[in-house]
Amino acid sequence: MSTPLDHIRNFSIVAHIDHGKSTLADRLIQLTGGLDTREMKDQVLDSMDIERERGITIKAQTVRLSYKAKNGEDYVLNLIDTPGHVDFAYEVSRSLAACEGSLLVVDASQGVEAQTLANVYQAIDNNHEIVVVLNKIDLPAAEPERVKQQIEEVIGIDASDAVEISAKTGLGIEDVLEAIVNKLPAPKEGDRNAPLKAMLVDSWYDSYLGVIVLVRVIDGVLKKGQTIRMMGTGAKYPVERTGVFTPKMVQVDDLGPGELGFITASIKEVADTRVGDTITEDRRPTENMLSGFKPAQPVVFCGLFPVDAADFEDLRGAMGKLRLNDASFSFEMETSAALGFGFRCGFLGLLHLEIIQERLEREFNLDLITTAPSVVYRLNMTDGTHKELHNPADMPDVVKIASIEEPWIKATIMTPDDYLGAIMKLCQERRGIQIDLTYVGPRAMITYDLPLNEVVFDFYDRLKSISKGYASFDYNLSDYREGDLVKMSILVNEEPVDALSMLVHRSAAEKRGRALCEKLKELIPQHMFKIPIQAAIGGRIVARETISALRKDVTAKCYGGDVTRKRKLLEKQKEGKKRMRQFGKVEIPQEAFIQALKMGDD
């Protein structure tokens, strides 16, 4: 039996990293009896090892909570736990579209952070009702009154009746549940007898059940035995089971309007289940599709290569499996003269890249080399055509290019004002253009336009070290702008190394080239002949370092003072070295690649 609409609440929790939303979710599950004490562990919803170690949420998860409110009525609360990190904003947007309300969790000691803002604005765009929750009230540094005022000033929502809680100790959790019931709206229209219309919120792969699809039913009823059709892809499947997460999987007979649950339908490929698609019944389809989500656009690209070429097939299989779970990760094959066969992969951001790499190494035991991350450039050719450039090594001849456009981002940085000067200097070094600066109490909020190219290397690390970890950073893509960009190639022994080529701004090319050459000089071992390492832009060498040759003392066995004999031996050695240099191949160790690619503008 489905729950009546006015007793359902679909909500998500919006917060900055570390403000305690996964802990709050744990307490809500515990209080409503979703899991018994034995099954309870910290961060129940963060199911991946990486999520728990890093203390971040990557995949959005859902739970159905049953709650008997103080007014004696029974309510069904569907919680969608969302990631807070900027790279996973795509997951956030999907979760928010399936709900009607949000809990905004703010740390009472830290106040509003950059990512809180980004996610709250997304919730407001989705016309969500917002309940403010102040967490960590038990900390000595908590300043609830100051933070309430800050929320009103920065976000512009009324925080006077914010719920004050401590998710760690369980203080005030009941008040949160009451606020959800009383302040958040029930799902809008929904007709049980209308043709089935449901939104596909997420999908992931389970080795036993195939693809599990998370759905939010809007009209009609979804039950076992129906044949459903994905309106976007046209694929049809018979429904095998319907159920909900409590957070364990519990099968139910049917899912009615306003409800969130899962279905399995022997779907083999997650690619067939596009997030944001409309699910309807094949026999009696709905007239109009839902406006789907925007598909995630990869922002950062890099090459992933196996250290051992024999692992290539394993890597291909592993990537296919990750692609099953992560719709925003894309890859295609590529070959590199230096690194052999591998893949060119697209990611939503640097954290996404790190996590995919770590999951490949961890879950599939692969050793990988990552090439320098690059962004997508637009090339305007002289013949009037336009091209997208994902890999700097594929850049066409400069003569054919009229101009190059690069992606720019709008970055919001929140920082204590002590570090403001250093952060502004960092942004200016990275070609940033200041848009806005406002003060909220002792914290400053700066808005900058920055080229993404300058951010992908190590901007985030530098920002954190300059501000002793206090600054928070959030960005979204704004537009493409023309830039004076040049391709920098690295030549080792006069041979270009494709894996190290990159697009840089002309003004920074020399500095970047010199730093890279110096780094490679330390990393490449000496050979029997002299090795020049050069950074070149077009035909012009902008930096050079030389690794001196290992030298065998050929004159050691000469006694006596005959200088001509010595000279003859030295000349002969010189000839040999010259020939060796002509035909000799320089072995660049894998460590050298890894270290050189890690190098930022130190």
Curated annotation (Swiss-Prot):
Q: Which reaction does it catalyse?
A: GTP + H2O = GDP + phosphate + H(+)
UniProt membrane topology term:
Peripheral membrane protein
**Localisation per UniProt entry:** Cell inner membrane
Q: Which GO terms describe its biological process?
A: positive regulation of translation
Whether Cell membrane counts among this entry's keywords is: yes
Name the UniProt key words of this record, in alphabetical order.
Cell inner membrane, Cell membrane, GTP-binding, Hydrolase, Membrane, Nucleotide-binding, Protein biosynthesis
Any one GO MF term held by the record is: GTP binding
E.C. numbers: 3.6.5.n1
Q: Can you supply one Gene Ontology CC term for this chain's record?
A: plasma membrane
Question: Sorted alphabetically, which Gene3D superfamilies does this protein's record hold?
Answer: 3.30.70.240, Elongation factor 4, C-terminal domain, Elongation Factor G (Translational Gtpase), domain 3, P-loop containing nucleotide triphosphate hydrolases, Translation factors
Question: Which residue intervals define the domain tr-type G in the entry?
Answer: 6-188
Identify its protein family: Belongs to the TRAFAC class translation factor GTPase superfamily. Classic translation factor GTPase family. LepA subfamily.
Protein name in the entry: Elongation factor 4
- What's the encoding gene here? lepA
